[in-house]
């Protein structure tokens, strides 16, 4: 399973974790990905999306219909 948000496109970030003695080791910061089910009233069906918590806020703000229309314009298959 990839840590990739379908709405915002957010992916893991990479960098170093630095210890007290300043030794560096590589690590990654994964976005908070949730699998959410939304109902599309226009199509009368449910869809399942893998979205970050920021993506959930975008859906709450803009509405699921607008977000799905935007994703389809970008070429994503929903």
Swiss-Prot record:
Disulfide bonds: none
Bias (Basic residues) ranges: 20-29
Record-level GO BP terms: translation
GO cellular component: ribonucleoprotein complex; ribosome
Highest taxon above the source species: Bacteria
A GO term, aspect molecular function: structural constituent of ribosome
Listed name of the protein: Large ribosomal subunit protein bL28B
Keyword Ribonucleoprotein: yes
Region (Disordered): 1-29
Source organism of this protein record: Mycobacterium bovis (strain ATCC BAA-935 / AF2122/97)
Record has Transcription as a keyword: no
Family indicated by similarity: Belongs to the bacterial ribosomal protein bL28 family.
Alphabetically ordered keywords of this record: Ribonucleoprotein, Ribosomal protein
